[in-house]
């Protein structure tokens, strides 16, 4: 387990990018699959049904779950594939691409495509589909991949099995963007706005039917591009919120529960469940609008808030992980090797001093922060956060809203920032992580402004064009120090992706970057 003490002493073996030139020669997803099933004798056949208490956040936007944007959940790799994939160590690997290279500053990227890949309808996947998919994802109106919309200027075919991305600005870490959960490859159409609604992908399973607010059914793709994969005949998924997850598991309805509630771990184990937990997972970022006349416009109040939160208590009480990492008030994740811990974990006396200096010697009551319980433990988590802040004289209510319609609600006023709220933050590479508090993101910095913000943006652009990993590391540390000093938002940290499965299921693995797993090509069941 990677804990805070290891981060502070530098003794942990920490996940990271490695040397950039290796990106183009990275081992493929096939190597990962082969290594995972090495020395096993997988059984062919069987049906696996999973329950997932965490629906796709975009379900309220469309009932057309055949499109990867609106699938039942965001773990879409069973039906679709992307050009690249991020492995369990957060290293990027080729998926439908076989290699990728860039010019010196990372402003132009060329991808070579895997040959002989077939869509579920029998059409071969070529550069026509890859270019059209990329343009769909980058489209200003209907595109759903924010990093494409920020960075992709245009996309060009390079023969039948290649494409070229021309970016708006350099980004030496761009292959991570082509692994995003919405960046799936779809069948090209003349009108790219119409793409994706047929449910046709290149993944190991073919979609049979879907009600994206309830369940989906899929069957084995006999023409999958990994020979002999998958092993299962059918894969089905069901949204299983609240007690439905544990009840469905104990009754035998579900073989697997993805994103299991940590408060139910003991019940799952008593029912014979086997747990798998990733090193980290999605996290919670508090968006604090600073463009309105609110008390936290004063940086001293924001610093006091951060110092008052008992993050180790969250890890201990909610996750039973007392030595887990804690948020550093950036979008960085504890498993990033570039992660820089806050110099002080918690200091109630300093929090009170800052409040008094800001004109609140008797404490302060702050505007409510809204959340929806995307993850089942959230109501308990925010209770711990709120109670710990009271010790410093800070009263802050965390108000629960339904997840269906949550985004329209929080974004309905004070555009483009919206209401005070918590946003979900997936574990990503450092450039994408740190871009979320920059001028590339209109909401999550919360209206952060001033010299620190300008310097932060300059450093982000510099890091994106820097091919030397050591130099990028120094830049990323400087950026994190700026954010920790000005606290544009607050990161809780410590959460880990987990799943539970029955004893007869093999190779079900939770992934730090939630949407990259499980790799169903590796999964098989005993008779």
Give the ranges of each region predicted by the language model.
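N-terminal lobe/hinge region of extracytoplasmic solute-binding protein
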Residues: 49-104, 135, 198-202
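Ligand-site clamp/hinge motif
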Residues: 223-267, 395
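Surface-exposed binding/hinge segments that line
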Residues: 112, 146-187
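Long beta-strand-rich cores associated with HINT superfamily self-processing modules
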Residues: 499-527
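Periplasmic binding protein-like
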Residues: 50, 122, 255-259, 387-442, ...
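Structural transition elements
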Residues: 323-357, 374-380
């Amino acid at each position: 387990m990677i804990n805070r003490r290891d981060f502070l002493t530098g003794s942990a073996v920490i996940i990271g990018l490695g040397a950039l030139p290796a990106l183009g020669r990275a081992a493929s997803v096939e190597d990962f699959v082969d290594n995972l099933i090495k020395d096993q004798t997988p059984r062919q056949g069987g049906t696996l049904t999973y329950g997932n208490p965490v629906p796709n956040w975009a379900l309220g936007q469309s009932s057309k779950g055949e499109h990867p944007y609106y699938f039942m959940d965001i773990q879409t790799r069973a039906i679709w594939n992307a050009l690249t994939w991020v492995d369990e160590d957060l290293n990027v690997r080729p998926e439908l691409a076989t290699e990728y290279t860039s010019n010196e500053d990372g402003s132009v990227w060329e991808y070579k495509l895997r040959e002989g890949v077939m869509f579920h309808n029998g059409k071969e996947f070529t550069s026509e589909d890859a270019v059209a998919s990329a343009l769909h994802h980058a489209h200003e109106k209907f595109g759903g991949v924010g990093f494409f919309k920020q960075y992709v200027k245009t996309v060009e075919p390079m023969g039948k099995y290649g494409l070229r991305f021309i970016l708006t600005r350099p980004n030496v870490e761009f292959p991570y963007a082509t692994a995003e959960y919405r960046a799936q490859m779809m069948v090209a159409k003349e009108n790219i706005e119409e793409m994706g609604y047929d449910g046709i992908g290149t993944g190991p399973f073919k979609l049979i039917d879907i009600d994206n607010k309830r369940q989906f059914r899929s069957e084995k793709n006999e023409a999958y591009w990994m020979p002999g994969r998958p092993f299962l005949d059918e894969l089905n998924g069901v949204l299983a919120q609240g007690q439905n997850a544990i009840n469905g598991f104990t009754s035998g309805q579900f073989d697997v529960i993805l994103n299991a509630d940590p408060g139910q771990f003991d019940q799952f184990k008593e029912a014979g469940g086997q747990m798998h937990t990733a090193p980290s997972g999605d996290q919670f970022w508090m968006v604090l609008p600073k463009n309105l006349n609110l008390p936290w416009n004063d940086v001293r109040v924001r610093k006091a808030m951060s110092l008052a939160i008992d993050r180790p208590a969250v890890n201990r009480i909610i996750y039973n992980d007392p030595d887990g990492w804690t948020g550093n008030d950036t979008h960085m994740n504890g498993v990033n090797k570039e992660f820089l811990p806050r110099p002080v974990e918690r200091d109630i006396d300093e929090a009170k001093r800052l409040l008094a200096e800001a004109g609140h010697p008797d404490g302060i009551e702050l505007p409510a922060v809204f959340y929806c319980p995307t993850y089942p433990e959230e109501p308990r988590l925010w209770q711990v956060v709120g109670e710990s802040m009271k010790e410093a004289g800070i009263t802050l209510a965390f108000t629960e809203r339904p997840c269906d319609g949550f985004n329209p609600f929080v974004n309905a006023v004070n555009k483009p920032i919206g209401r005070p709220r918590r946003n979900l933050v997936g574990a990503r590479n450092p450039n994408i992580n740190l871009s979320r508090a920059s001028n590339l993101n209109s909401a999550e910095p919360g209206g952060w402004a001033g010299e620190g913000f300008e310097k932060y943006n300059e450093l982000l652009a510099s890091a994106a064009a820097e091919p030397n990993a050591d130099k990028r590391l120094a830049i990323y540390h400087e950026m994190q120090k700026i954010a920790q000093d000005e606290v544009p938002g607050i990161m809780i940290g410590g959460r880990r992706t987990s799943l539970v499965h029955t004893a007869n299921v093999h190779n079900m693995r939770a992934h730090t970057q939630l949407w990259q797993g499980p790799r169903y090509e590796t999964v098989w069941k005993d008779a």
